[in-house]
UniProtKB/Swiss-Prot annotation:
One of its GO terms (biological process) is positive regulation of DNA recombination. This is DNA replication fork-blocking protein FOB1. It is found in: Nucleus, Nucleolus. Residues 479-493, 506-516 have a biased composition (Basic and acidic residues). The keyword Zinc-finger applies. Present with 1510 molecules/cell in log phase SD medium. Residues 517-555 have a biased composition (Polar residues). Interacts with NSI1. One of its GO terms (molecular function) is rDNA spacer replication fork barrier binding. GO terms for cellular component: nucleolus; rDNA heterochromatin.
C-alpha cells in the first residue's frame, strides 16, 4: 500500500509540511515512461516528502533498482567527505542533547583535548533543537537540518515524486527547507537515477573538492571595490555611514576603509590611499555597487594625478562581489554595538578575522596566499601587466594629460590573456586567441568566469562559516609548495601597429553599426564585444566633466548614480 501523496499544496518554509486546511490524500501517481512529456516545473507545485520517508515507494518499473540501491549504500560515505556536514553520530548527540566534550572524544579519535572543546563551542553556537525535536541550523536562517541517514531518501524521493526534477531547481526547492542539502549532494544522488543517467557512469567515490574559480590569477592581479552601508544608515563613531570594501580575487584577502559619504570629495582620497599603499597596483579593478561611469571617473582622477596605470575589468563575478559584502555585513552586525562605537572593532571582527581564517575555496588562509613567496612572482606580475596593455585595443586605452597616467579597459584580447596558462603563447610571442571575432564573447565570459550555482557555493557561506569555526580552529596548515620558476618566460612584443591612444578616437566604419542595447539596469562594468568601447558615446568622460566645469554646473562632490541594491 502506498503512502499518501500531497498534490497542489504549498509548503511552509519552517515546518516543511502541508497546511492542514488544504491537505488531502490522492492516488498514487501513474508510472510514466522515460519518453513521456512532462510539464514545466515552473507551471506546477512541487511535492516534498516527509523526513524518513523511503524513496522506494515512488520507484517506477523501468528504473534500475540495483543502481538506486548502490546510491543508498555509498551516499553515507560520500557525505563524510564533505565539509560543513554533520556525521550521524554528532547529529544524534545534538538531537538527544547529550553533546559534550567527553562524548565527542568517545565517537572519534580526532576530537581530543582542546580540539574537542573548540568543536563543542562551534557546534553549540550553530545548532540547536527546537520544541518539536528538530535539529536546526542557527546560522542558516534556522532551517531544519536533514538527518544524515535520511539525506539520500529525501533527495531521491523528491526527485522521483516531482517527475525527475533535477539540477538547480531541485537544489533550490530542497535548500529552502533543509540547511544541509548542497549542490554536491544533488549532483551525487541524481546520478543513481537510470532515467537521468542513461549511460550509468558513476563518479568515483573520493573526497569532493570544490573548484577554485580563480586559481589561474596572480595575487593582486584582479580586485573589486564596493561601497555600502553596513548598518543601514547608522554611523560608525558618529562619522562614517559607509565603508569601502576591497577584496583580491585570488586570495580573498580584504581591506576595509571608512567613508563619510559617497561623494567624490570623500571617496577619491580613500581609493587613492588604498592604491598608493598596495605592494602592486592591480591589473584590473571591478565593482558591482559603483556605477561604471563613476568608477571610470574615480580611476581617471587617480591615474592622472598620481601617474598610475589602472585597468577596468569586465563585470564577471557579481555573486563573488555580493558574497564579500554580505559576509562583512554579517560579521559587523554580529557585534553591532561594539563596531558602532569603535572603528577598530570593525577591523577586528571584519577583515582581521577573515584574512586569518582558512578559506574553503583556496584551502588556505587569505594572508598566506597573498604573501606567498613564489619564485619570480614579481617578474611574472609585471610581465603580465605589460602583455595585457600591449594586447589591448587602442580604442579601449585612454592616456591622461601629460602622458603620465593610463586607463585601459578589458576586452576579448586581455580577458583571454589574463586567464591563459603560462605556456599559451608560441615561440614567436604571438598570443593565440580563439575568441577574436567571436560574436558570442559575452557568453564565453560567463562560461569561464561566472560563479554559477552549480559549481560554486556563495563566498558568503564560506566566510560566515569560517568566521565562527576558524576562531577556535588550530593552525594545521602546511607551507605552500613552491612551483618551479620558469626562466624561459619572455614578454610578448606588440604584433601590430599601435594607433594613437585617445579616448575620443572614432571607431571604424564597421564598428558604427554595433548595438547600443546594453541593459540600463545593470550599471556595472561590462564590455560585451571586442569592438565595444567602455562608453557608448564618442565623448570621453573627462571631456564631459570639462564642459560641466566651464558652464559652472560641475559638482565634483555629487552623489553616486544607480548602485546595485542589496
Amino acid at each position: 500500500m502506498t503512502k499518501p501523496r500531497y498534490n497542489d499544496v504549498l509548503f511552509d518554509d519552517d515546518d516543511s509540511v502541508p497546511s492542514e486546511s488544504v491537505t488531502r490524500k490522492s492516488q498514487r501517481r501513474k508510472a510514466t515512461s522515460p519518453g513521456e512529456s512532462r510539464e514545466s516545473s515552473k507551471d506546477r507545485l512541487l511535492i516534498l516528502p516527509s523526513m524518513g520517508e523511503s524513496y522506494t515507494e515512488y520507484v517506477d518499473s523501468y528504473l534500475n533498482l540495483e543502481l538506486l540501491e548502490r546510491g543508498e549504500r555509498e551516499t553515507p560515505i560520500f557525505l563524510e567527505s564533505l565539509t560543513r556536514q554533520l556525521t550521524q553520530k554528532i547529529y544524534e548527540l545534538i538531537k538527544t542533547k547529550s553533546l559534550t566534550a567527553d562524548t565527542l572524544q568517545q565517537i572519534s579519535d580526532k576530537y581530543d583535548g582542546v580540539v574537542a572543546e573548540n568543536k563543542l563551542l562551534f557546534l553549540q553556537r550553530q545548532y540547536y533543537v527546537d520544541d518539536e525535536g528538530n535539529v536546526r541550523d542557527g546560522r542558516n536562517n534556522d532551517k531544519i537540518y536533514c538527518e544524515p541517514k535520511h539525506v539520500y531518501d529525501m533527495v531521491m524521493a523528491t526527485h522521483l515524486m516531482n517527475k525527475h526534477l533535477r539540477g538547480k531547481t531541485l537544489h533550490s526547492f530542497l535548500f529552502s527547507h533543509f540547511a544541509n542539502i548542497s549542490h554536491a549532494i544533488i549532483d551525487w544522488v541524481q546520478q543513481f537515477c537510470s532515467k537521468c543517467n542513461k549511460k550509468g557512469k558513476i563518479k568515483p567515490l573520493k573526497e569532493y573538492k570544490r573548484p577554485d574559480m580563480y586559481d589561474k590569477l596572480l595575487p593582486m592581479e584582479r580586485i573589486h571595490i564596493e561601497v555600502f552601508e553596513p548598518f543601514n544608515g547608522e554611523a560608525i563613531e558618529g562619522k562614517y555611514s559607509y565603508v569601502l570594501l576591497c577584496r583580491d580575487y585570488r586570495s580573498s584577502f580584504m581591506w576595509l576603509l571608512p567613508l563619510k559619504s559617497t561623494k567624490f570629495k570623500h571617496l577619491i582620497p580613500v581609493v587613492s590611499s588604498l592604491f598608493l599603499t598596495f605592494a602592486r597596483v592591480p591589473i584590473f579593478v571591478t565593482s558591482s555597487t559603483l556605477d561604471k561611469d563613476d568608477l571610470y571617473d574615480i580611476c581617471e582622477e587617480i591615474a592622472s594625478k598620481y601617474g598610475l596605470r589602472i585597468g577596468l575589468g569586465l563585470k564577471s563575478s557579481a555573486r563573488f562581489h555580493t558574497g564579500g559584502i554580505l559576509c562583512i555585513q554579517y560579521a559587523l552586525n554580529s557585534y553591532k554595538k561594539e563596531c558602532l562605537a569603535d572603528w577598530g572593532k570593525c577591523l577586528r571582527y571584519g577583515p582581521y578575522r577573515f584574512n586569518r581564517r582558512r578559506n574553503k575555496r583556496t584551502k588556505r588562509k587569505p594572508v598566506q596566499v597573498l604573501l606567498s613567496e613564489v619564485p619570480g612572482h614579481n617578474a611574472k606580475f609585471e610581465t603580465k601587466r605589460e602583455r595585457v596593455i600591449e594586447n589591448t585595443y587602442s580604442r579601449n586605452m585612454f592616456k591622461m594629460a601629460g602622458g603620465k597616467g593610463l586607463i585601459y579597459l578589458e576586452d576579448v584580447n586581455t580577458f583571454a590573456l589574463a586567464n591563459e596558462a603560462d605556456n599559451s603563447c608560441n615561440n614567436n610571442g604571438i598570443l593565440h586567441n580563439n575568441n577574436i571575432g567571436n560574436d558570442n564573447f559575452e557568453e564565453e565570459v560567463q562560461k569561464q568566469f561566472d560563479l554559477t550555482e552549480k559549481n560554486y557555493i556563495d563566498e558568503y557561506d564560506d566566510l560566515a562559516h569560517d568566521s565562527s569555526e576558524g576562531e577556535f580552529e588550530p593552525n594545521t596548515l602546511t607551507p605552500e609548495e613552491k612551483p618551479p620558476h620558469n626562466v624561459d618566460e619572455d614578454r610578448i612584443e606588440s604584433t601590430g601597429v599601435a594607433a594613437p591612444m585617445q579616448g575620443t578616437e572614432e571607431p571604424e566604419k564597421g564598428d558604427q553599426k554595433e548595438s547600443d542595447g546594453a541593459s540600463q539596469v545593470d550599471q556595472s562594468v561590462e564590455i560585451t564585444r571586442p569592438e565595444t568601447s567602455y562608453y557608448q558615446t564618442l565623448e570621453s568622460p573627462s571631456t564631459k566633466r570639462q564642459k560641466l566645469d566651464q558652464q559652472g554646473n560641475g559638482d565634483q562632490t555629487r552623489d553616486f548614480g544607480t548602485s546595485m541594491e542589496l
